[in-house]
């Protein structure tokens, strides 16, 4: 819910507000359709409300940045298409010959987000609010992080770069520092960014060549990213004295600084030695919030403080309150991120520390959790400060609107034309040609962003050796499949990974490192990206059924110091037996080798296995109905990692072992 609120509600509405304000002024024409503008606005708010309702109810696809289920995915597609039609309708009827740099980023954003959303949302519905991903295991992970990384790139970055190229020059009353640099920045950024997704999967079961591509292109990203940051900051040349007094410029300078910090740190974290330390820790959480709070948040605030007085023909109601917002927001970012950086360093060091005799110092994962709880309290303080500043802005804007007079129609504006060099008569810069042709800009942008995805995904989907199989790995039983779906709906993937990396510290703690062939029936994959709790890839058979029963009932009481919430409803709610045949049927459509005849008898198999687990619990004095959800969850957890725990005589040649 938190992630989707930031992306769809906070950043999404910031994008649309900025585009709907800047686009008519850059093109010297009103938006093409007021009806489409309002329809798109209300449809987007409906999507936000639907996310706020469905996610807490456990209706989730479990794919990071793409958790929303298939009906909402369709609604997102429709709303995005409406936005695109309106944007291109406005561009095509423009009264300005050339497209300004901000519009290049708007166009690339629209076409790339459309491509990412359609490809990643390939799923087969099971019920109205449940679907299974069309991809499995390694393939699903690659597609997801091709999407996930580029959701950050083309929803949290490129549209905001477009807004930066409009609002920073307007607020500073200065032209963009370098037109040529903006060209290089744009094309290099959109081409390189799309390749970098695999850096989220380093040391995983993803093929090594794909991981290497992700690392190389991530490092290359530093150049265009910093080119854009410098182009923005150098636009303020001659106006730095105003930064002390102008709250709009203050917000924008900090936003650009945070953008530079995040886009340097991100590529550095794609270097394997750093990634080995940062992945699964709070270091990553700190990193993304420098971008979300500093770059997206502060640029949005600066934009609002600029455009609201313009729209209502007045000055901001209270400059002191706006400055208070700036400083309390900055403190909020500091208190939010710095403790999480320290928590991340602590987690990594504790996870990897061995005694002189070669044993893990902190064998119990909970030791790390207890050590960093201070960081979560400081994070809460930082978030409170940041939200308090936001309320300052809301009140300030409210009073500004009340004292002003809304300007319904404003004379359109555009940046001053560049001084003629005489080259225009003979064709000018090569880029001038494409700046006058929005459809060609759209097509070339699509080609630039599609290349990387095709190169990374086609081999993984077509070359079988990239996803090796293990003969002992079998599909989930109906009960385990139901348990897996409950695991997903409860959001367990947010705190637990299912990917053991090939480090001695991890194999000592969790067991043998994960193989690609283990996940061929996982629709969707559950590798995770954060360990608030221990990895579960090899948890099957590690504890008795009764341990899982009591642990799910009251984790804090059963494991002293645990911050895991209890799940009492699992002990009251029955398994949805009616959905079992449909789930097996959809899995068959996705290529999971269930016999067709098994669909009709799936619930018989489910109840038989559930009965065995209930009988086993009864031996320990635990009486529970075999149809309760907790039985399915126990079945799923006890299955994890057991397929490759076979006797030596039954082991296949594709299964390898690690030695210490």
Report the location of each language-model feature.
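Extended amphipathic secondary-structure runs
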Residues: 388-400, 533-534, 543-550, 619-658
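Sequence context of c-type cytochrome heme-c attachment sites
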Residues: 1, 5-6, 141-142, 427-435, ...
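Electron-transfer interface patches adjacent to heme c in soluble/periplasmic c-type cytochromes
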Residues: 445-450, 508-629
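Surface-exposed patches in mature extracellular/periplasmic domains of secreted proteins
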Residues: 495, 561-567, 644-652
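Electrostatic cytochrome c docking/interface patches
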Residues: 464-488, 502-503, 532, 619-629, ...
């Amino acid at each position: 819910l938190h992630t989707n609120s930031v992306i769809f509600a906070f950043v999404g509405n910031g994008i649309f507000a900025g585009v709907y304000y800047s686009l008519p002024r850059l093109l010297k024409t009103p938006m093409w359709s007021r009806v489409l503008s309002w329809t798109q606005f209300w449809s987007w708010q409906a999507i936000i409300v639907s996310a706020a309702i469905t996610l807490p109810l456990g209706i989730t696809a479990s794919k990071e940045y793409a958790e929303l289920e298939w009906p909402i995915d369709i609604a997102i597609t429709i709303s995005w298409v409406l936005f695109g039609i309106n944007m291109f309708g406005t561009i095509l009827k423009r009264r300005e010959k050339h497209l300004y740099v901000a519009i290049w980023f708007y166009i690339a954003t629209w076409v790339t987000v459309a491509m990412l959303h359609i490809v990643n949302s390939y799923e087969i519905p099971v019920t109205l609010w449940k679907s299974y991903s069309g991809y499995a295991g390694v393939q699903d992970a690659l597609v997801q992080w091709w999407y996930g990384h580029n959701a950050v790139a083309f929803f949290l970055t490129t549209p905001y770069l477009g807004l930066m190229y409009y609002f920073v020059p307007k607020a500073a009353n200065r032209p963009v520092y370098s037109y040529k640099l903006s060209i290089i920045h744009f094309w290099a950024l959109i081409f390189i960014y799309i390749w970098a997704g695999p850096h989220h999967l380093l040391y995983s079961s993803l093929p090594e060549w794909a991981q290497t591509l992700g690392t190389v292109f991530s490092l290359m990203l530093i150049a265009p990213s910093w080119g854009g940051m410098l182009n923005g900051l150098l636009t303020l040349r001659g106006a730095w004295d105003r930064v002390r007094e102008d709250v709009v410029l203050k917000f924008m300078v900090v936003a650009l600084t945070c953008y530079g910090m995040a886009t340097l740190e991100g590529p550095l974290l794609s270097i394997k030695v750093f990634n080995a330390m940062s992945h699964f820790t709070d270091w990553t959480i700190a990193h993304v919030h420098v971008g979300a709070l500093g770059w997206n948040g502060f640029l949005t605030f600066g934009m609002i403080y600029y455009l609201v007085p313009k729209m209502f023909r007045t000055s901001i109601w209270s400059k002191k309150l706006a400055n208070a917002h700036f400083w309390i927001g900055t403190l909020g970012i500091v208190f939010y991120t710095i403790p999480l950086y320290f928590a991340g360093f602590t987690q990594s060091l504790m996870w990897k520390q061995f005694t002189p005799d070669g044993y893990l110092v902190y064998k119990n994962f909970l030791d790390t959790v207890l050590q960093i709880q201070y960081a979560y309290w400081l994070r809460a303080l930082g978030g409170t400060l940041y939200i308090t500043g936001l309320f300052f802005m809301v009140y300030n804007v409210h009073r500004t609107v009340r004292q002003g007079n809304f300007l319904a129609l404003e004379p359109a504006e555009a940046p001053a034309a560049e001084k003629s060099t005489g080259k225009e008569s003979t064709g000018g810069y090569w880029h001038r040609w494409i700046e006058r042709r929005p459809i060609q800009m759209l097509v070339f942008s699509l080609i630039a962003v599609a290349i990387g995805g095709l190169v990374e995904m086609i081999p993984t989907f077509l070359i079988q050796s990239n996803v090796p199989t293990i003969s002992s790995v079998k599909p989930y039983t109906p009960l385990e499949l139901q348990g897996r779906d409950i695991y997903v709906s409860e959001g367990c993937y947010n705190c637990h990974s299912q990917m053991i990396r090939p480090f001695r510290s991890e194999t000592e703690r969790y067991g043998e490192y994960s193989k690609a062939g283990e996940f061929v029936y996982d629709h969707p994959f559950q590798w995770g990206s954060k360990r608030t709790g221990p990895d579960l890839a090899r948890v099957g058979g590690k504890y008795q059924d009764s341990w899982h029963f009591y642990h799910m009932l009251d984790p804090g009481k059963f494991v002293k110091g645990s911050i895991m919430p209890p799940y009492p409803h699992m002990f009251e709610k029955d398994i949805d037996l009616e959905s079992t045949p449909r789930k097996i049927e959809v899995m068959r459509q996705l290529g999971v080798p269930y016999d067709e005849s098994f669909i009709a008898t799936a619930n018989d198999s489910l109840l038989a296995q559930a009965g065995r687990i209930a009988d086993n619990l009864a031996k320990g004095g635990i009486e529970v109905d075999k149809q309760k959800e907790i039985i399915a969850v126990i079945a799923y957890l006890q299955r994890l990692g057991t397929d490759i725990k076979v006797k030596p005589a039954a082991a296949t040649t594709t299964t390898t072992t690690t030695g210490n």
